[in-house]
Amino acid sequence: MAPRIPLPGVEDMNDAQKVVYDKIVSGPRGTLVGPLRAALHNPLLADCWQALGQVLRYETSLPPHLNELAILVAARHWNSELEWTIHAGAA
């Protein structure tokens, strides 16, 4: 099944997209997955989104394993299979 929004490959990114991509993969995430990848079509949106996500996931007062557990609790509550899949390994 083809994605609804074509996902940009690294080799096809323009300069602005590449800057945001490099920020994401060189940071604590280490990889680019999920809807943030589609957001790269708008580099400003993707950059703001990744910055907010980084603060919410990596810069809280909770220890990392409890932060991941909180994400899983929210994912389960909202039946978010994507969030569960992304975060289950880290919890």
Region locations from a protein language model:
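Acidic, glycine/proline-rich low-complexity segments that act as flexible tails and inter-domain linkers
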Residues: 1-62
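Conserved alpha-helical segments that form or flank metal/cofactor-binding pockets of metalloenzymes
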Residues: 48, 62, 66-69, 74-91
